[in-house]
Amino acid sequence: MRRKEQEITDRDELYRILRAARVCRLAMVDGDRPYLVPLTFALDGDDLVLHSARAGRKIELLRRNPAVCFEVEEGVEVMQAETACDFSMRFRTVIGSGEAEFVEDRAERARLLALFVSRFGAPAGPLPEVEVQRTCVVRVRVRELTGKRSP
């Protein structure tokens, strides 16, 4: 990282940012081009957990190539200045990479989907079986994390 004074290396701080963020942007490989989608996510230990419909471009790409990159940010604010070129941003961001795995086990899918319920404040309780069956759950095994902050 060019600006070492802005680098976040503390693992606990990186995961605090991940827990605070509500949306991640997941980048995948589509032939010779990147493909990026915004998603809600949950955390299971060190892993990101994503959910989706069982079909679509994202699912096709993940099945072809499970290598992914993701980004989250929190505390983003434009810092206005007297002149346009002096504007800045306040932020904390995490960029990570890893491998996507499809969760096929029904009980594990239900457990991971329950993490979304608790993360986003939906009423607790058993998930409808039809939702567990029709929802695709993807675990991203995080291999690398980097972080950056700007005051």
Report each predicted region and the residues it spans.
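Extreme N-terminal tail/first-helix region
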Residues: M1-R19
